[in-house]
């Protein structure tokens, strides 16, 4: 990313960009760390569902951080989306320590999205996204060295390196840069709903690529999430429009 945006990054090298970008990186690190630790103590489905609760939390985070107006459409869409994610991902209703940790991660995801939406409109989003990656990378490296067992050199095969490069560049750098650019141009509540499509998209690719069964429950979840996005974007105004009188 530095190779592409180095001129802008160097030109905008100041304390404000560093503080905002590194702060966003710290929020992202906390969110992913809690999500990962929580996953070790709960099921994958519950982890995905509870992480998806950020779609409800983002409107409140944006309200407190930037005064973004809360509307009944935002809240209704968030609840509808959460119900859809529940149908797609939730496999039980028991609550344990892993669920609580995962929910903490969702809080940090919501704050990070609200911060990105607030400052992305005022600052160069590419620059602060670069510093976000730097902050997240430093904290991830330190925590990995402190708490993780380091893999032997034998695992670094050409195939493993290609997979890691795809995950690091394509699924992380490119995806999060696009996400941040989008959040800088839409309300945070709308952005969080669109990002919640990650859950049904994961299931959809599991169906297409891995042969997972597509059940009526999954279809119902997809429909609810899709309806939540339509509600947020259109308020279903097209259903209330009066037909034009014919001459």
Where are these regions (language model features)?
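Hydrophobic transmembrane alpha-helices of multi-pass small-molecule transport proteins
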Residues: 2, 70-89, 106-109, 140, ...
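Specific transmembrane alpha-helical segments of multi-pass solute transporters/efflux pumps
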Residues: 6-51, 85-87, 168-186
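Glycine-/small-residue-enriched transmembrane alpha-helix faces in small-molecule transporters
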Residues: 26, 34-37, 91-118, 138-140, ...
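Helix-helix packing/entry segments at the starts of transmembrane helices
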Residues: 47-53, 116-138, 168-208
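Hydrophobic alpha-helical transmembrane segments of multi-pass integral membrane proteins
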Residues: 1-4, 74-80, 97, 101, ...
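Transmembrane alpha-helices of multi-pass small-molecule transport proteins
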Residues: 1-30, 57-61, 108-115, 130-148, ...
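C-terminal transmembrane-helix exit sites in multi-pass transporters
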Residues: 1-6, 54-76, 200-219
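C-terminal-most transmembrane helix of multi-pass membrane proteins
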Residues: 3, 160, 195-247
């Amino acid at each position: 990313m530095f190779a592409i945006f180095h001129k802008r990054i160097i030109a905008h090298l100041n304390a404000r960009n560093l503080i905002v970008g590194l702060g966003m990186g710290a929020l992202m690190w906390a969110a992913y760390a809690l999500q990962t630790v929580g996953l070790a103590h709960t099921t994958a489905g519950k982890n995905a569902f509870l992480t998806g609760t950020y779609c409800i939390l983002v409107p409140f985070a944006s309200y407190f951080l930037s005064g973004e107006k809360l509307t009944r459409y935002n809240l209704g869409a968030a609840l509808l989306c959460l119900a859809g994610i529940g149908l797609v991902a939730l496999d039980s209703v028991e609550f344990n320590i892993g669920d609580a940790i995962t929910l903490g991660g969702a809080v940090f995801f919501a704050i990070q999205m609200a911060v990105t939406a607030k400052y992305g409109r005022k600052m160069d989003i590419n620059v602060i996204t670069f510093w976000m990656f730097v902050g997240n990378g430093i904290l991830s490296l330190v925590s990995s060295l402190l708490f993780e067992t380091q893999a032997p050199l034998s695992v670094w095969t050409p195939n493993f390196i290609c997979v890691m490069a795809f995950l690091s560049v394509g699924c992380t750098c490119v995806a999060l840069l696009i996400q941040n650019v989008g959040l800088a141009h839409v309300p945070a509540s709308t952005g969080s709903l669109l990002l919640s499509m990650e859950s049904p998209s994961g299931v959809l690719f599991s169906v297409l690529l891995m042969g997972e069964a597509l059940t009526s429950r999954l279809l119902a979840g997809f429909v609810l999430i899709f309806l939540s996005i339509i509600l947020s974007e259109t308020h279903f105004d097209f259903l209330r429009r009066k037909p034009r009188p014919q001459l």
